[in-house]
Amino acid sequence: QYKPETYVGPDKLRVLVSLDLSKPQTMKPLDRNAGLKKQYTEGGRTVPVSWIRTFEGGRVFYTNLGHNASTYWNTTVLQHYLDGLQYALGDLKADATPSAKITREEVLAPPAP
């Protein structure tokens, strides 16, 4: 069973950093991820959660959904996996034409079970 080191789960939450927001910020915080933030946020670059495409005569389905057990048993996520697998196997037709322009849409996580 997968158990990441920095996050065990909602029932055994391990706090790594706590901030006291009542104290004023006197120093600019060290941002070690500034380069990554610039790479992924400036210029409108999006990082897809899931995608399909054709490659060398075959079909490809990719998703990075799922980081804990509750995600893997969510019926919506399971249907997403099934649809993607069926597409990759050739059982489900879908338009895999690359998007010329992606419109951003906010998507909320499903409610907790």
Q: Which residues fall in each region the model found?
A:
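Catalytic beta-strand/loop cores that center a nucleophilic Ser/Cys/Thr
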Residues: 1-56
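Active-site-proximal beta-strand/loop segments in catalytic clefts of secreted hydrolases
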Residues: 18-21, 63-67
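Phosphate/oxyanion-binding loops and surfaces in catalytic or ligand/nucleic-acid-binding neighborhoods
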Residues: 22, 87, 91
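A short, polar/proline- and glycine-enriched secondary-structure boundary/capping micro-motif
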Residues: 26-28, 72-75, 105-108
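Active-site rim elements
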Residues: 36-40, 66-74
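Long alpha-helical segments found as membrane-embedded helices
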Residues: 44, 58, 92-113
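Short amphipathic C-terminal alpha-helix that caps PH/PH-like domains
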Residues: 77-88
